[in-house]
Amino acid sequence: MLSYQDKVGAFYKDNARANSSRLSLVTEDQGGRRPPYLLFVLLILLVGIMALLAITGVRFHQVSTSNMEFSRLLKEDMEKSEAVHHQVIDVLTPLFKIIGDEIGLRLPQKLNEIKQFILQKTNFFNPNREFDFRDLHWCINPPSKIKVNFTNYCDTIGIRKSIASAANPILLSALSRSRGDIFPPYRCSGATTSVGSVFPLSVSLSMSLISRTSEIINMLTAISDGVYGKTYLLVPDYLEGEFDTQKIRVFEIGFIKRWLNNMPLLQTTNYMVLPENSKAKVCTIAVGELTLASLCVDESTVLLYHDSNGSQGGILVVTLGIFGATPMDQVEEVIPVPHPSVEKIHITNHRGFIKDSIATWMVPALVSEKQEEQKNCLESACQRKSYPMCNQTSWEPFGGGQLPSYGRLTLPLDPSIDLQLNISFTYGPVILNGDGMDYYESPLLDSGWLTIPPKNGTVLGLINKASRGDQFTVIPHVLTFAPRESSGNCYLPIQTSQIMDKDVLTESNLVVLPTQNFIYVIATYDISRGDHAIVYYVYDPIRTISYTHAFRLTTKGRPDFLRIECFVWDDDLWCHQFYRFEADSTNSTTSVENLVRIRFSCNRSKP
């Protein structure tokens, strides 16, 4: 009987397990032949992975490029949206506001105007109603078959508007050249030089008269906003007899136009000659708004009566338009309407100006009211120090111990009312020169510059600020001082005890330029040089600068009259000057009228 082990061995005798050692050898043999296949599989896997990575990179690049393009397009869209937003805010919103204003505000106003127009048209055909025909449209073209009772108002208003429309281009050209600064810039570090030139007046009426043997005396010129005006006494050569009976009063007005080399040209457009028997020995002048106005008297001092007992004399009023043959050319004697306290006024050959259809002049006035303020000013100033004026017992121009006041003459030029000369007064700095006052318009203030000329080489003159409104005031500006000994509103003009310069034979008026900076000019007839000369002094008190320039004369003589009127043209100072002198060689009197130009320049400027 076989044991267990023998049974097992017999079972596996023909089985593979019995040859297990051989089988293992065969298995090792087969395992040795597998590595090439594995490497091939691994290589394929590696290639697949690299392909996947390449595909992934390409896709990533495409996605990045797509994102960048999308970002660019998005940015462009945002910029376009922002531009549209700004267009809406900056353009459409204001446009909508304008449309809203037009529809909500102006359209109802226009409809209301149309309604009023229709009502006025309808009213013209109502014969039972009276109308005011002062509207220019009804003056020019009244309805047919309607009887209209016209006055001079329609003619004057229509002519004035037509003239203003025609003259506007000339005035604008002149104004654009008359507001500059004549001085070099503040950066000037070198020497300032001045160059002067003299020009004749070729197309002026007065020059044509001077060129003949006729004599012109006491010429007065005023310039305002591109318009000039003159008045003077003419002694024709064909008249014989007493000199005083031969004087003819002449007025002229015209434009300041641009001429050759852009220089100004005073072109006469209208003039008026008063008959010999007219009361026009002494005349003021005012120019503005295309009009000349003048007040004329036979005697400078005018007595004013306030009751019916006195016979009040009239003052001759002359108005002249820029063009002739219009209702604005008129001569009329007017009875003045003075303040009850004004007893006398002193009219001289001095200038004013026209503003808002009102001609205004300044004159010395004698008033009956107590002058305690002025007297106290003098008494307190003279207690401790002796000023030259402290020894005066008579005051110009009226004489006697009463100080003159400041008088203002206003003449409304409204064609709808009659001419009326109103006289008011106020107090101010003490007046030492009674020859007269010039009144210049201030382009920046609701007032004017009141100037009193120097006199006899001892009084330097005076420049005050005078208001134009109903509240008439005079405030000192330059060439005055407040004495330490006095208190309150006390101002005195500068005066010296002796003549400061004996080589100065005569002095002109003080002229304030129509510039933004306060600048004034004065001229003198000087004999200190080898040749006689007219010397100009230009002052700017605010910037504390001043310049001089001398125009040497080819003649020598003794002057008895010197008058200037200055304006700015292309940043240069231009002055119209008129002077009379008695020639030393012939003892004959000669009148000279011309234009002078002073150009200031700087040698070098700071960078």
Swiss-Prot record:
Residues 1-37 are intravirion. The chain crosses the membrane at residues 38-58. It comes from the Viruses. One of its GO terms (molecular function) is host cell surface receptor binding. The keyword Lipid biosynthesis does not apply. Residues 59-607 are virion surface. It is a single-pass type II membrane protein. SUPFAM superfamilies: Sialidases (SSF50939). Glycans are attached at residues 149, 309, 391, 422, 456, 587, 603. GO terms for biological process: symbiont entry into host cell; virion attachment to host cell. It is found in: Virion membrane; Host cell membrane. The keyword Membrane applies. InterPro entries: Hemagglutn/HN, Sialidase_sf. Keywords: Glycoprotein, Hemagglutinin, Host cell membrane, Host membrane, Host-virus interaction, Membrane, Signal-anchor, Transmembrane, Transmembrane helix, Viral attachment to host cell, Viral envelope protein, Virion, Virus entry into host cell. GO terms for cellular component: host cell plasma membrane; membrane; viral envelope; virion membrane. Binds canine SLAMF1 at the cell surface. Attaches the virus to cell receptors and thereby initiating infection. Binding of H protein to the receptor induces a conformational change that allows the F protein to trigger virion/cell membranes fusion. The cellular receptor might be SLAM, and may explain the lymphotropism of the virus. Belongs to the paramyxoviruses hemagglutinin-neuraminidase family. Non-sialidase subfamily. This is Hemagglutinin glycoprotein. It comes from Canine distemper virus (strain A92-27/4). The gene is H.
